């Protein structure tokens, strides 16, 4: 009865007037997050499913827009001919932020299928990223017999709320500070591994002067980046514009892991799993004046964890 109720609203996908579902269906799931709940219905938009044959050659694709996906309760019937396939699933690539290579049936190999961030000619990106998701399934046999296969997604986008505050609560000038996040993660391969060789420079997609609830003046910059890997070269820099000096050059990934915190219901997880599950961070930096006129940042907070910075991270 539950199956009939579910699929009675999905005839627009099945084109089958029978109440009994048939065929191979893909259930889009996103439980690989810090809350350990399925958030596909609220976080995943469009889905692109790429099918490859047993020789890893491209066969066909299915693009499912957000409305269609959610009307179908994140269930998609796979329309490919009866055969065994390797499936590569990307979520969030329907716009112009992400680029796939030209796909040719029978020619394009799965290992050559990298997705790239559409940066400007300086390899910079200053917009809010569309949430990007990845999944892959091996040896999936399509048939007319009813079956449901789950595709568990990994989220590849990370968002940072960077707050700059004077330690004496003095006002700051927004134009005096420039934030930059750099990482060689602007190209991701079919295994969801960043393979870029040129650093992508992520600039704030929003930066403003603001007041905290205690009426303390701050500079609030919002940045984002693609997938972060343990041991990678992702850095966050803050430049003091009047002097031209970089006052912070932070190996970001290791500091995110210093503040690793997650609910007990997830169990013990690796550093990489934490980086993949967590997608939102608040970074607070406390400015300290100096006799040279160039401020310093000796202390920061990562998601409420206070960290004292080493001189090597304080720029030059």
Where are these regions (language model features)?
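Bacterial Sec-dependent N-terminal signal peptides
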Residues: 4-31, 308, 315
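A short, Gly/Thr-enriched small/hydrophobic beta-strand-prone motif that recurs across taxa
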Residues: 16-35, 152-167
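Intrinsic-disorder/low-complexity, polar/charged segments enriched in Ser/Thr/Lys/Arg/Asp/Glu/Gln
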Residues: 23-27, 73-75, 146-148, 159, ...
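Short consensus segments that form the blades of beta-propeller domains
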Residues: 37-42
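Tryptophan-paired
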Residues: 48-101, 173-264, 316
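Short, low-hydrophobicity acidic/polar segments
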Residues: 59-155
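A sequence/structural signal for flexible, mid-protein segments enriched
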Residues: 119-216
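Hydrophilic extracytoplasmic domains
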Residues: 229-316
């Amino acid at each position: 009865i539950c199956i009939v109720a579910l699929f009675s609203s999905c005839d627009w996908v099945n084109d089958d007037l029978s109440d009994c579902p048939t065929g191979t269906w893909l259930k889009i799931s996103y439980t690989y997050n810090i809350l350990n709940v399925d958030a596909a219905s609220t976080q995943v938009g469009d889905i692109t499913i790429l099918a490859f044959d047993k020789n890893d050659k491209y066969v066909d694709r299915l693009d499912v827009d957000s409305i269609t996906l959610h009307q179908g309760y994140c269930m998609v019937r796979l329309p490919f001919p009866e055969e065994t396939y390797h499936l590569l699933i990307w979520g969030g690539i329907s716009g112009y932020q992400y680029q796939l290579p030209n796909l040719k049936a029978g020619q394009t190999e799965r290992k050559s299928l990298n997705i790239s961030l559409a940066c400007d000619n300086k390899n910079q990106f200053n917009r809010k990223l569309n949430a990007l998701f990845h999944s892959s399934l091996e040896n999936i046999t399509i048939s007319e017999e009813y079956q449901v296969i789950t595709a568990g997604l990994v989220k590849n986008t990370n968002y940072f709320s960077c707050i700059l505050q004077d330690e004496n609560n003095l006002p700051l000038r927004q134009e005096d500070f420039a934030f930059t996040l750099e990482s060689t993660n602007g190209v991701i391969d079919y295994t969801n591994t960043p393979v870029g060789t040129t650093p992508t420079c992520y600039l704030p997609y929003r930066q403003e002067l603001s007041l905290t609830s205690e009426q303390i003046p701050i500079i609030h910059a919002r940045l984002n980046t693609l997938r972060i890997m343990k041991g990678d070269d992702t850095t966050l820099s803050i430049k003091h514009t009047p002097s031209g000096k970089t006052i912070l050059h932070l190996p970001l990934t290791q500091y995110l892991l210093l503040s690793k915190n997650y609910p007990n219901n997830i169990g013990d997880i690796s550093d990489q799993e934490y980086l993949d599950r967590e997608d939102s961070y608040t970074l607070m930096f406390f400015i300290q004046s100096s006799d040279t006129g160039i401020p310093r940042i000796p202390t920061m907070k990562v998601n409420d964890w206070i960290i004292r910075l080493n001189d090597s991270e304080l720029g030059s």
